[in-house]
Design a protein with these regions (language model features):
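Catalytic-site beta-strand/loop segments enriched in glycine and acidic/polar residues
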Residues: 98-128
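Membrane-anchoring hydrophobic helices of lipid-metabolizing enzymes
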Residues: 1-34, 43-47, 52, 78-79, ...
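Residue-level preference for the first positions of well-ordered beta-strands
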Residues: 32-34, 104-108, 140
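Short, basic, glycine/proline-bearing loop/turn elements
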Residues: 9-10, 76-82, 111-115
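Catalytic core of membrane glycerolipid acyltransferases/transacylases, capturing the structured
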Residues: 29-86, 94
């Protein structure tokens, strides 16, 4: 319900302010998948959700709950909040549970936004592979070409799914 309402309220202003095109929509599988995305700005997940009309579980940093409004929105969109200071086993278990239920998980494996636009990707944390292997889930790369700027088109590319089958036990 909340995602539907957000789409209605945000579609026109964001389509004008941040026109976005998504390439590779057909690469998305029907069932569970881990959407592994680079992280250019706070708009990344908003633009993806707005233009794909896809329901996903978002792995988000716990600090986002400090803003009551934003925390409320993310919680009701089904976000899993992770404490980046240590090994947050409960957040990892919640992500794995969502995947076992056939849901999609949207994750930023760098754990933070990449400020340097000349780089494609920052250092990736190890949790992504562990979650994919333990849940036998395909990984799709989602690449935000550049940081969104007002009235400049943004492109999002979705890669073909791949699995780490050689590591499945």
């Amino acid at each position: 319900m909340l995602l539907w309402l957000a789409r209605i309220l945000l579609w026109i202003p964001l389509s004008i302010l941040h026109p976005t095109y998504i390439y590779g929509r057909k690469n998305r599988p029907k069932g569970k998948a881990i959407l592994c995305s680079n992280h250019r700005s706070n708009w990344d997940i908003v633009l993806y959700l707005l233009h794909t009309k896809e329901k996903v579980v978002i792995l988000a940093k716990k600090e986002l709950t400090k803003n009551k409004f934003f925390g409320f929105i993310l919680k009701h969109l089904g976000a899993v909040f992770i404490d980046r200071e240590g090994n947050d086993i409960n957040a990892i278990k919640e992500c794995m549970k969502a995947l076992k239920e056939g849901k999609k998980l949207y994750i930023f494996p760098e754990g933070t936004r990449l400020k340097d636009e000349s780089k494609i990707l920052g250092e990736i944390k190890s949790g992504l592979a562990m979650i994919a292997i333990k849940t036998k889930t395909p990984i799709l790369t989602v690449w935000h070409e550049r940081k969104p700027k007002a009235f400049r088109r943004s492109n999002i590319y979705i890669g073909k799914p791949y699995e780490l089958t050689e590591f499945y036990g």
